[in-house]
């Protein structure tokens, strides 16, 4: 194979190296006229044509080989064109008539690693081929990488709660419905007597505490500034104060209503009436203070920014006065504890 290649004559360039570098017309003699005039006759030489150079030992990818082949041919064409005169155009025509076979082997591209340009920008490309065009289209969806950590908001995340329904549920838990077993009020089992027993102090404290616990998250929501939602919150607080007043004071005792005593026992120790009354006052006062703090939260979140006299200001003032009246009666022991 090496002997065959060496026996093949080497084709030289049509212009000498000096004329090619200067991009001037060459007489194509040995030496050329230009080199003789410049006193460079000994330096005048013709290099081998690049079109017949040695091929690469290893075959590169189809894209590199095709681009390098075309680049070489266009370079040689430019070098040769710089030395052509008007009478030499026939040689260019004969060279241009030659067919250049470029073989593109797509199998060689399998070893090329795919670099996703969208990945570097923080996007995830969808490599699923399109059914209509057969092209790969990038899907401009934000990735979960450290470059872009912003996630698309879920449509149900903004309105995943219903403050009005929750407020109605809390208000309904304070309702005195004698037809249900879970009511705060208990009716007498004797129908003809038609008497209703007032809920005990422990029942009132338990129900009111659960209602206030469920009300606090609703007060901190932005929906609490809506007037109709704020009125529901005000109704819940008014109902809580109402049950405190009914359970603590004795002025709401009427015909057909009876009080139920509550027995307090600390382990094996039985407390007398005075100890039970003292313990009840302490627990009730503590729960009333908690209700007062919830009322302050309602006043701060439901208030408007205009600084005017809103309806909730009057409602909060009335509820505070009523709550303070219950607290003062407990402290003075004027109310009748159950």
Swiss-Prot record:
Principal localisation: nucleus
Q: Which keywords does UniProt give here? A: DNA-binding, Metal-binding, Nucleus, Transcription, Transcription regulation, Zinc
The superkingdom listed in its UniProt entry is: Eukaryota
Molecular function terms, GO-annotated: DNA binding; DNA-binding transcription factor activity, RNA polymerase II-specific; zinc ion binding
List the stretches of this chain annotated as a DNA-binding region: 16-44
GO terms, biological process? aflatoxin biosynthetic process
- Induction cue: Expression is induced in presence of sodium nitrate, and repressed by glutamine.
CC terms in the record's Gene Ontology section? nucleus
Compartment(s): Nucleus
What happens in the null mutant?
Answer: Impairs the red pigmentation due to the production of fusarubin. Results in complete down-regulation of the other five FSR genes.
Query: What is the role of the protein in this entry?
Result: Transcription factor that regulates the expression of the gene cluster that mediates the biosynthesis of fusarubins, highly pigmented naphthoquinones responsible for the coloration of the fruiting bodies.
Q: What is this protein called?
A: Fusarubin cluster-specific transcription factor fsr6
Organism, scientific name? Gibberella fujikuroi (strain CBS 195.34 / IMI 58289 / NRRL A-6831) (Bakanae and foot rot disease fungus)
Recall the taxonomic lineage recorded for the source organism.
Answer: Eukaryota, Fungi, Dikarya, Ascomycota, Pezizomycotina
Gene name in the database record: fsr6
